Amino acid sequence: MRQFDVIVVGAGHAGCEAALAASRMGCETLLFNINLDSIALMSCNPAIGGLAKGQLVKEIDALGGEMGRMADKTAVHFRILNASKGPAVQSSRVQCDKQLYRLAMKSVVERQPKLHLFQSLVDCLLVKDGQITGVADQTGVCFGAKAVVITTGTFLNGLVHVGTSHYPAGRAGEIASISLANCLRKMGFEMGRMKTGTPPRLKASTIDFSRLERQDSDPAFEPFSLSTERLGKERLPSYFGYTTSETHRLIRDNIRFSPLYSGVIKGVSARYCPSLEDKVMRFADKGRHPVVLEFEGLETEEVYAKGLGNSLPLDLQEQIVHSVPGLENSEILRSAYAIEYDFVQPTQLNHTLETKRVRGLYLAGQINGTSGYEEAAAQGMWAGINAALAVQGRPPFVLDRSEAYMGVLIDDLVTQGVDEPYRMFTSRAEYRLILREDNAALRLTPRGFDLGLIPQDLHEQISERIRRIEEGMKCLSSFKIYPGTAVNSKLEEHGSPAIKNPVTLFQLLKRTDLSWEDLSMFQDLPDFPEDVPDGYDRMIRKQIEIEAKYEGYIQRQREAVVRMKALESRRIPPGMDYSAIPGLSNELRMKLARVEPETIGQARRITGMTQAALAAVMIMIKKKEQDTRGQSPLPAQSE
């Protein structure tokens, strides 16, 4: 039996990041995939990033991951979402050439030292005395490992639905992983069923784009990756259209043919990415729904028809597509379909994504009940890092909710579990003002360097930027502007109120009507800082300006983080008997026993937890601590 340090099962977005992280940290790693030609395949939309997802991609890159680099390399359309809003909710999104992305990632994986590829279907896990020891494939060949990461996406008991027809598949054209799903169930894991889907792909030459609204790429765009020096020049537009009353009539009149509404599909659908059937039936008051057409690549006729996802029979799909203005004569190249698959309830995982039931077994991606390439990649990297650290006998890697969107994602999964496909949103991150997309590198590159995933030169570059930001803030805070006719005239020329008392440049920069560049109006003042405004690069200027304009809000969030960390530092003894705590509801007792929170902070985030219940848990912890020290549980009370 061949032996490896780490085995990764599934080479999608989670699997690639897991395998690359483990091998780059020095572990001999084996990456399985059912088909090596579908490594990092974009099964659904041809895009990377989006609201809150862009933050995840930047964080993956800051830790030394690959998704951001591949997105930059293969992008053909760029957008900054929420550009008119504050920096806390701005996110980047790119459309990629789907085939170029797959090939680029495959090339990286193939060339990575210590990373071995093998095309096969893994059927079962090998476990001895509660410790993972390897896997066996469909031919019965065994492969040994000290740690195994499962990143199977929608392949566990996958079932594709098109109208009244359904067949086992991990996605259209690829076989499902049935034996591995059964293996996990036999091992005692609590599992559930979820459903997702994908819209039809249309032939570009059969679409009348003149009847649709064109959207071109944003001219100015920051790359996802720190290592990207320049972006490609080739661009493709997107097009917008809408469904019609005829579209909606076709769906309502034929809803009985939808497996979603006939009761055939049992899996839970994603609330935030509903099928067209759901949109029409649940939002009957809406006269139309948006349709977005996105090219899948530079050298293909395939167009992704976002908004037309459904699971109806092909003949009805054609009628629905043809009911959209501009698509009357369009040809379907690939039909839309729905897919059901098994997932493992993630409350059975530790914060490292290692399972509580089997040591050395890690789960990442859609197997944990999430949706989205970015959520999968973030989990894959997290699991791969921790698998490597465990093999090497090093402390685990965990980021908390104040350190990264990745930390929010993992904590939500293992603390609250999922009852529908989980998608990341900026609203899930309570500290989003300090977890911005623009400061991901400053937050996490030092951590990536400590793990051995970030090279020395990049680490030094980011360290210098951090130093320059601190220096720039100090510089602006130390130079004062005094009220006077000349000074106030300059301010009024820029549409900013006059000053009555001395203010620093940093205080002026807090004003919404002044930017960093506007500070140059005072360059003729004696001793004006020579590095302002041109002595700092654009990234440094942006960080200083955000720190100035949002200083009060940022400070409040940092104070909230201190309070949160105080709760996180209060450990809950392992094996706590929640049934013995008076005042807890049966529901909370079950949730606490199921999640097994490690800290008071984590217990506080369990759905349904109340202040009274949390106080009861803390009293029991204090009692156990006192009992351990041989003291009486409570001090005597004097009358």
Curated annotation (Swiss-Prot):
SMART domains tied to this protein: GIDA_assoc_3 (SM01228)
Entry keywords, A to Z: Cytoplasm, FAD, Flavoprotein, NAD, tRNA processing
This protein's GO CC annotations: cytosol
UniProt subcellular location: Cytoplasm
Family: Belongs to the MnmG family.
Functional summary from the UniProt entry: NAD-binding protein involved in the addition of a carboxymethylaminomethyl (cmnm) group at the wobble position (U34) of certain tRNAs, forming tRNA-cmnm(5)s(2)U34.
Protein name in the entry: tRNA uridine 5-carboxymethylaminomethyl modification enzyme MnmG
Taxonomic path: Bacteria, Pseudomonadati, Thermodesulfobacteriota, Syntrophia, Syntrophales
Gene name of this polypeptide: mnmG
